[in-house]
Amino acid sequence: MIELHPYFVSPATPTTTALDGSWTGVYTYDENIPLTSWWGKRFGIGPSARVTSRRSKKFTDKSTFQTYDDIVADCKASGELWEDPMFPAVDSSLFYSRRPPKAFEWKRPQEISAKPQFISAGASRFDVQQGDLGDCWLLAAVANLTLYPSILENVVLPNQNFDADQNYCGVFRYKFWRFNHWIEVCVDDRLPTFDGRLVYMHSADNHEFWSALLEKAYAKLCGSYEALKGGSTSESMEDFTGGVAEVFDLVDDPPKHLFRILRKSAERHSLISCSIDADPNVYEKKMDCGLVQGHAYSVTAVKQVHVMSPSGREGEVQLIRVRNPWGGAIEWNGAWSDTSPEWTCISVDERKKMGLVFEADGEFWMSMHDFLKNMQKVEICHLGPQAAAAVNRTFDDENEKKSWEVQTFDGVWTKGATAGGCRNFLDQPPRTFPYNPQYKVTLAEAGGFFLGLSIHMYNPMAANGHGIFCELFSKNIMKSTLKQFLSTP
């Protein structure tokens, strides 16, 4: 068992003392840090936000925002479709630093398709196709999300459609995990188009719109569509699950037994992505092998299969199934690709078990050897206990039950109180570094354990000017200093 306790050093009392149960009063968000007000006005429009935020009375203030039910009631009374005042159909919702490169036209799904569907024949990873926005990192996470319907339904809320007889009012809602809260985000269904086609994320089925509206809701969460250009897949996977991400550098610090890590993570329903670093001189450069530099991919399956060569030699091969969020024919063309002769070494029954399909759909298989040779980063999002319970699974590792718990603490840097500055002020005057919020880790009993540390920061004056900045500090730094704080009773 591991215990985490917040510590606070007062400038007036330079000795470190543990806080009691009233510690949240020190770290609570006040009017000087208008986080709750900002969330409430822009995103906190669902009952989930009101329930999970014990520190925010403003989430319950209906004068600050409308709930989904309020929006539906207003639309029914007026007979008009909803138009989101917080994320309007204007250029500023698309770009914050420049004007749109084209004359985009905002259209509702009924103006794009004669028979629009929210989800048609179930959501799948093939519903996720990238448009004219560099957010492959987001699409890789969305494609992974579709692998687990129970988790998907927590983000893409069910019972939404375009049927006027079933409360269709032009409003759709999604849920995202941000700063220890499930935030419900409502958007209207006006989508940017050019020449009658969706500009950004879309489904392979032109009549299906759940993925396009999900991207719009996430763009609203981040401030604009442009804010989605370039990002971290692990961040979006955490936003979809409330889980904790782990990032592996395959170039400078490749982990031992990566295949085992990937296979166990897949068995535990973790979300997995991989990526190739960008060429600074070329945007998303396609390589001769069919892979794309500066691009993120979904890992959709991890298998170890039996093979037999034409000469009768037998063995095992480790295979990774990868999906390009672009869809289409831009796929890996090396060993174990769609047209590779290696597949003749696997029995027909084994191929059926693998769900093997040879199509120009953006999905392909690679050997572990080629995966390590070409991919440069792997990001794994381990589900939190709530999401894990949703998929009805337990951690089984070598016949030993594994379980884990999550503890979260909210803190703020307040001038004159908890803003102690960087490590430069640890030993030199005014020696204020200890005033920063601290958390002591205590190993309450003997035995092995794994401790993952994830720190996110909210900045109302983020670089994009739209109020959200989420940073995952280096876990390596945390691990290197962890020994200073571990103690046993």
Q: Where are each of the predicted segments found?
A:
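Structured alpha-helical subdomains that flank or immediately precede key functional sites
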Residues: 1-489
